[in-house]
Amino acid sequence: MNVIFIEVYLLALFFVITKAQLRKEAYMSVPSLIKAAGYPVEKHRVSTEDGYILQMHRIPAGRRSARRSGEPNRKGKRAILIVHGLFGSSGDFVIMGPERSLAYLLADAGYDVWLGNLRGTVYSTHKKLKRNDAQFWDYSFHEHGNDDIPAMMDKVLEITGPPWEPPVFSQPCRSSPSITTK
């Protein structure tokens, strides 16, 4: 009987400790996760023509890179924009940690990584509408592909200039294939 009690106690203790460790990262923002992983991070805001304000997260260098956030000389680094799919956010590309997450792997490979957030995520707002307004949520994939992604692409090009890679991981890319010609 005492053995069962001790096993249950140890199991409960394990779950309490594990839950405490998970809780810390579960409530961190994407920029906080990136910074905690040892990468430089920048937040940028971009406005769409229909008034949405989208937050983008930039990882301008890998952990072992000499270049850090805010340095003007990109030294030929290629910028790459990664955009999440339905019900996602930029967190999708950093949540698995530095050894397995796409954003970190690309940054360590020498890319200037930009993580885009489409309208409807926690990282989007609107100039006039509030989240509880029905009009805030009145959009479709059409607006993702025709408004959000081109605005993000323009922001990347404004900050970094060429060379750059068009979006490579995005469900809305099919909405407007012509955007890859920017």
Question: Where do the protein language model's features map onto the residues?
Answer:
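Cleavable N-terminal signal peptides of Sec/SRP-targeted secreted and luminal proteins
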Residues: 2-20
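Short, hydrophobic/aromatic-rich segments at coil-to-beta transitions
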Residues: 38-44
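Hydrophobic transmembrane alpha-helices of multi-pass solute transporters/permeases
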Residues: 2, 47-51
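Alpha/beta-hydrolase active-site loop
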Residues: 134-160
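Short Pro/Gly-enriched beta-strand edge/turn motifs at strand-loop
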Residues: 24-30, 38, 133
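Eukaryote-biased feature marking scaffold/signaling PDZ-domain proteins and nuclear chromatin regulators
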Residues: 6, 41, 51, 75-78, ...
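Glycine-rich nucleophile elbow surrounding the catalytic serine of serine-hydrolase chemistry
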Residues: 84, 147, 165-180
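Short, surface-exposed "cap/lid" segments of acyl-processing enzymes
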Residues: 28-29, 33, 48, 55-131
